[in-house]
Every structure is written in structure tokens, then in C-alpha cells.
Amino acid sequence: MVHDILTQLPVTHLAIEGFDRSVSIGGTDISVICGVNKYEKVQDLYKRKQGLLPEKESNAPMEWGGRHEPAIRKKLRDMYPSIAVLEPEKDYPGVMTSKEIPWAHCSPDGFLFDRNTEELSILEIKTASMWSQKMWGSSGSQVYPTAY
């Protein structure tokens, strides 16, 4: 059932490995373009898309965030047995480009499928250090850093 819904989305599914991010714009790029991403300037993003700057290398927070994603997905499965937690590159190709807006892409950290309501939601996992957690609201709130 859930895979039928995924195939009906107006997107092209692509594997993460080998995907050329320079030919489209993703969520992180949008935050840079809007001027709310404190980690990159719009001029650097433009140069990166043009091939004038190398792709950004992963740093420790990015690496550890990625390492925690499987554990967080498992915890969600344990906490909410009526919800299927789908994993990129296992349950679906990890990158999607819009069929209507081909220059737009996303790479969700997963999908949540509620077996009771048959609703599909995007799962985006973020981890925060003790230094950055003050940018986030209390658990369950809708307060999150502007760049997201």
C-alpha cells in the first residue's frame, strides 16, 4: 500500500549515490538563497553550483547526525507501531526531483506512513548539541531554527 502511494507522487526517484546536486536546488539551498542559513553565503552557493567551489565536506555534526538517523527511525518504530517508518535507499530511492519543477530536489530522512489513516508524511531528522539546543523549542513545540 505505502509503496503504491510513493510511486504516485509527482516526483522522479533517484539514488543518492551519483546524484549531481549542482543541477537543482534542495531545501538547504533554499535557506541559503533566502539568507537565513548562517553556515553558507548565497555567493558561495552560486559558485558551488557553477563548479567554481568544491562541494562542502561533511563535518562532525553532519556526520553524527547521519549516524544517529537509523537509531532515531528505530525508536520511532518502537514508539509508534501503527506507523511504518521508511528508510532512504532501503525502502525508496533517496533523492526525489519534482516532475513539475525539475530543478527542485529533496532527500528526506524518511517517510512516515500511518497504517490507520493511510496518510504519508515526510520525516526530517535533526539532532542538536547542547550548545545549539536553545535554538529549538521544548519537545512537541513548533519552534525550530529559521533555516529549517
Please place each PLM-identified region on the residue numbering:
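Charged, glycine-rich intrinsically disordered N-terminal tails and low-complexity linkers that flank
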Residues: 1-71
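Mg2+/Mn2+-dependent nuclease catalytic core
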Residues: 55, 62, 72-73, 79-148
